[in-house]
A protein has these predicted regions:
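Histidine-centered active-site loop/cap adjacent to the catalytic His
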Residues: 232-262
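Alpha-helical cap/lid subdomain in secreted, periplasmic
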Residues: 74-231
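Short linear interaction motifs
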Residues: 59-68, 127-131
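Conserved alpha-helical elements of sugar-nucleotide-dependent glycosyltransferases
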Residues: 28, 32, 133, 200, ...
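Serine-esterase "nucleophile elbow" of acetyl-processing enzymes
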Residues: 1-57, 61, 69-73
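Short, surface-exposed amphipathic charged segments that create phosphate/polyanion-binding patches used
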Residues: 62-65, 230-236
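Conserved catalytic-core segments centered on acid/base and nucleophilic motifs
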Residues: 23-24, 138, 245
């Protein structure tokens, strides 16, 4: 399905090169790519959507300078949607520490010693460096018709994570580096991971406002009564959403295109 590749062949454009909407960014963009690959979607997507992603899906998500230069080449006159990171809370706070921590304002079930409350401002300061590259990327897309930043899906509940984390190399490697088995580590609570995700969404929205771009959040319909990602949208791994979630995003992008068309 790839039509164009970057100079090294590492990155590719999937879909029509003349598509009005260009989706790019990190690993959560894969759900849109998977959705646009469905036969029923290929026949019915209007306006057309193209996704710039890895040529080899198993080699990991995009992110280097060549990738963003390729996006710039493709962006002229397009509505560019950047799926920015979205896994910082999973990568940094999947496991509890000793002593246990929480965020101020988060309700935690406590057994024994109370967790140490961390101010929200401190968490925001911790995450901010993961957004700084946007200050370099956004100005290079000056020829785009519009730019929108989109965050990743809300977290999955503990019940799902416990079933699949034993097979996820990123997290088993963390455990190995600590000299323990991943099954011995305590996963942070749903309420804490959800609030960490909320901080990320707030930060991305703030950067969008500062950089003069649009912001598109997770569709509310994708979340359960507790705010977590609904089970019908789970990919098999710990952190990502599936093509059904991608279909929801495609619909949001169609609405977005109508709002920002020039």
């Amino acid at each position: 399905m790839a039509k164009l590749e970057s100079k090294s062949g590492k990155w590719a454009l999937y879909g029509d090169v003349n598509a009005q909407i260009l989706v790019c960014g990190h690993s959560h963009a894969a759900s849109i790519l998977e959705a646009t690959s469905l036969p029923e979607m290929q026949a019915g997507i209007e306006p057309k959507i193209a996704v710039c992603y890895s040529t080899d899906w198993s080699a990991g998500p995009p992110g280097d300078k060549e990738y963003w230069d390729f996006v710039v080449e493709l962006s002229r006159g397009k509505h560019v949607v950047i799926i920015w990171n979205g896994n910082q809370h999973n990568a940094n706070f999947m496991f509890q520490t000793e002593p246990k921590f929480t965020m101020l304002g988060v309700t935690e079930k406590s057994y024994g010693r109370e967790p140490v409350p961390i101010p929200r401002a401190m968490i925001k300061d911790f995450f901010k460096p993961t957004f700084e590259e946007l200050k370099e990327i956004i100005p290079t897309l000056a020829n785009a018709a519009s730019i929108t930043l989109m965050n990743g899906p809300s977290p999955k509940p503990l019940s799902h994570i416990q079933n699949c984390i034993l097979q996820e190399r990123y997290f088993t490697d963390i455990a190995k580096s600590l000299g323990v088995d991943v099954s011995d580590l305590v996963i942070t609570s749903d309420s804490l991971r959800l609030e960490l995700w909320n901080v990320l969404a707030e930060l991305l929205n703030n950067y969008a406002n500062t950089l003069g771009t649009g912001f598109l959040s997770t569709p509310e319909i994708s979340r359960d009564a507790f705010g977590m990602l609904s089970s019908e949208y789970w990919a098999p791994d710990v952190t990502h959403a599936n093509s059904k979630y991608g279909v929801l995003l495609v619909e949001e992008l169609r609405k977005l295109s109508g709002k920002v068309s020039t």
